[in-house]
Amino acid sequence: MAKPERNKKPQQAEERDDGMREKMVAVNRVTKVVKGGRILGFAALTVVGDGDGSIGMGKGKSREVPVAVQKAMEEARRKMAKVSLKSGTVHHTVMGRHGATTVMIQPAPEGTGIIAGGAMRAVFEVVGVTNVVAKAHGSTNPYNIVRATIDGLSKVNTPAEIAAKRGLSVDQIQG
């Protein structure tokens, strides 16, 4: 079986006039078996972000690919969530889980870039993370990876939040 052809240049997230970055993660051909035969359709997975810490994931199904993608984009815009970032990276190492997928996300110094695979890369690009190291363990299903990545990003706490929980000052936390 031949390997799928890969793009040499990284794909940039498509930016709309409202300032949102959109990225299509996966499109699957699906079939529904009925008495008269098979009905072909498409399922799309997309992520939308503002490049400043907001992220949304959407799924859409339809008989045609463009309609499925449009439905997924609309759902992603409705399900936006805010995550805490620190100058293009995360504050600390976090683990995200969904189903059989575990994702480890680590902060990285300036100039590192996004070192992450497929579906995780799309999430980081639209959310506004520019320097990060991430690794997925377990299932590599794009749906699970996107959900686990968003789960991990939602667990990131700022130093101020950690200091408030511990009853200390931010200076004491950062040592």
From Swiss-Prot:
Main function: With S4 and S12 plays an important role in translational accuracy. Located at the back of the 30S subunit body where it stabilizes the conformation of the head with respect to the body.
Classification via InterPro entries: Ribosomal_Su5_D2-typ_SF (IPR020568), Ribosomal_uS5 (IPR000851), Ribosomal_uS5_bac-type (IPR005712), Ribosomal_uS5_C (IPR005324), Ribosomal_uS5_N (IPR013810), Ribosomal_uS5_N_CS (IPR018192), Ribsml_uS5_D2-typ_fold_subgr (IPR014721)
Domain notes: The N-terminal domain interacts with the head of the 30S subunit; the C-terminal domain interacts with the body and contacts protein S4. The interaction surface between S4 and S5 is involved in control of translational fidelity.
Gene Ontology cellular component list: small ribosomal subunit
BP GO annotations: translation
Family: Belongs to the universal ribosomal protein uS5 family.
Chain spans, region Disordered: 1-21
Assembly information from the UniProt record: Part of the 30S ribosomal subunit. Contacts proteins S4 and S8.
Keywords assigned: Ribonucleoprotein, Ribosomal protein, RNA-binding, rRNA-binding
Entry's Gene Ontology molecular function annotations: rRNA binding; structural constituent of ribosome
Segments forming domain S5 DRBM: 20-83
Name of the featured protein: Small ribosomal subunit protein uS5
Source species: Dechloromonas aromatica (strain RCB)
